[in-house]
């Protein structure tokens, strides 16, 4: 679809900036287009918890005034000036309710800003609102939200994934130009896959966690959800980097990710395909599209190598133990402290995870569970290090199945762990990965992911950008008139 034939809210970041710089559109027009889309469709999609309409329009008017005064120079210090975005509700936003979709934090107004949202604010981005999620990020469908369940814009009888499901749905439904989410083990890539958009899970420590309500502190990674890999690269340029407020951030330079394709080409890279990621139980539609994608890339000139890696079942066990243990520790700080209004207790999923975590950390069981899980985690990290001596990148399906019907997750206590089985290993190892659409099957999106060595964002983004230059899958968006019957 040509840029000038799109509705304003359908534009990418790069397209929006081009038109803003040419004076073809204003930030107010762009912001109103997104707000109008929210008004029209969000009563069915339910992506947003809070819409900051007045603030967004105020910021848009301010952006237009700066552009009027400074012209093209306005973007020198504010590279996202005038661009509206959505933000997952576990990022602290000063003066704006931040709930993590939990009744525990309902009414909580943070007195400070997260590093990520502060960087976006400094870059001139405009906050449209806070998006729904699984409560405290405990889930892969948004069904554990204490408020409501977000629906997949491609088919509102299906889940958008989670825990960043609200952000992914908002991007897919063109209710924002881009969004911000967080991932512990699939919470960016999973929703991106099921909603047919692009999602970047940065290396652990590449982006600051300061001001993000913690789930599992050793794997939590903030990152962008957008319409293209190029847009994700632009956002990563802004939010990545060392932060003195987060001691776990990497003290290494941030490359200009938009220039990554100048250094890398898919045709000169060796890409590994772990047989353990392909030989697992994949839904027929997913397997068909993955095989088509591999054949397409081979025809393009990509060199593939089959890899023999650790079975994914180990990652499921390790992640389940470590995540529950860290949840138990992190949520203990909230119990009994009045953050907001009178509220209900923790939801069922949060209680389940805290109890299991308390068990694995308790005397007599620590060595049997938590300590052993940490040892196996080291083996997983070493397994990836060995693989990356043989290949430059790893390619795999992002999700093993198509977006399931709302309600399916309630039938399995390990729904999220099984859905995220292809993402958990790289999350445990702290590796970067980008999920990109590779087609649709029976009207639902299918996605692949490029996984790279730690701190190789430039490499995975280069692969994703080139992939999207040679196909059009990322240009497909849901027909909301049909799916929502508006």
Model-derived features: where do they sit?
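Structural helix-boundary/capping segments
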Residues: 40, 122, 173-179, 184-280, ...
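Short, basic, low-complexity termini and linkers enriched in Ser/Thr/Gly/Pro
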Residues: 3, 65-77, 257-268, 484
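Short glycine/serine-rich loop/turn segments
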Residues: 80-222, 276, 325, 396-414
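Long amphipathic alpha-helix in the N-terminal Rossmann-like dinucleotide-binding domain
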Residues: 54-61, 124-125
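Conserved hydrophobic/aromatic pocket- or pore-lining residues that grip, position, or stack substrates
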Residues: 34, 56, 88, 120, ...
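An N-terminal boundary/leader segment
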Residues: 1-55, 299-301, 476-486
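Serine-dependent amide/ester hydrolase catalytic core
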Residues: 15-18, 35, 265-266, 277-279, ...
């Amino acid at each position: 679809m040509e840029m000038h034939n799109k509705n304003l809210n359908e534009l990418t970041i790069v397209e929006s900036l081009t038109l803003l710089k040419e004076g073809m559109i204003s930030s107010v027009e762009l912001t109103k287009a997104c707000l109008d889309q929210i008004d029209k469709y969000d009563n069915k999609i339910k992506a947003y918890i809070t819409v900051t309409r007045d603030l967004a329009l105020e910021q848009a008017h301010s952006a237009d005034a700066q552009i009027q005064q400074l012209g093209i120079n306005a973007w020198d210090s504010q590279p996202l000036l005038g661009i509206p975005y959505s933000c997952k509700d576990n990022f602290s936003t000063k003066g704006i309710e931040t709930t993590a979709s939990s009744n525990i934090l309902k009414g909580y107004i943070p007195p400070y800003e997260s590093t990520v949202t502060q960087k976006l604010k400094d870059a001139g981005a405009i906050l449209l609102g806070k998006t729904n999620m699984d409560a405290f990020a405990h889930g892969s469908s948004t069904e554990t939200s204490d408020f409501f369940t977000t629906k997949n814009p491609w088919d509102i009888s299906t889940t958008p994934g989670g825990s960043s499901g609200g952000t992914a749905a908002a991007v897919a439904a063109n209710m924002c130009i881009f969004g911000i989410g967080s991932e512990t083990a699939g919470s960016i890539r999973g929703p991106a896959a099921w909603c047919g958009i692009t999602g970047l899970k940065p290396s652990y420590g590449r982006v600051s966690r300061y001001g993000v309500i913690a789930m599992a502190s050793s794997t939590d990674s903030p990152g962008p959800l957008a319409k293209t890999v190029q847009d994700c690269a632009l956002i990563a340029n802004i939010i990545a980097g060392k932060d003195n407020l987060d001691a776990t951030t990497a003290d290494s330079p941030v490359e200009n990710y938009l220039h990554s394709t100048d250094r890398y080409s898919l045709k000169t890279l060796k890409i590994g395909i772990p047989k353990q990621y392909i030989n697992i139980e994949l839904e027929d539609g997913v397997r068909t599209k993955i095989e088509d994608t591999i054949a397409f890339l081979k025809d393009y000139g990509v060199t593939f190598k089959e890899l023999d890696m650790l079975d994914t079942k180990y990652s499921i066990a390790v992640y389940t133990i470590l995540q529950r243990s860290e949840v138990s520790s992190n949520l203990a700080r909230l119990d009994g402290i009045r953050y907001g209004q009178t509220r209900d207790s923790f939801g069922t999923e949060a209680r389940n995870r805290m109890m299991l975590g308390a068990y694995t950390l308790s005397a007599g069981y620590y060595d049997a569970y938590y300590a052993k899980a940490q040892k196996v985690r080291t083996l997983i990290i070493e397994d990836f290090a060995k693989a990356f001596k043989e290949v430059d990148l790893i390619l795999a399906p992002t999700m093993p199945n198509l977006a399931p019907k709302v309600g399916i997750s309630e039938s399995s206590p390990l729904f999220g762990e099984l859905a995220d089985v292809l993402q958990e290993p790289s999350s445990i190892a702290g590796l970067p990965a980008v999920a990109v659409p590779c087609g649709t099957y029976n009207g639902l999106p299918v996605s692949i992911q490029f996984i790279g060595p730690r701190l190789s964002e430039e490499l995975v983004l280069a692969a994703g950008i080139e992939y999207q230059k040679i196909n059009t899958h990322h240009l497909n968006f849901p027909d909301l008139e049909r799916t929502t019957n508006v």
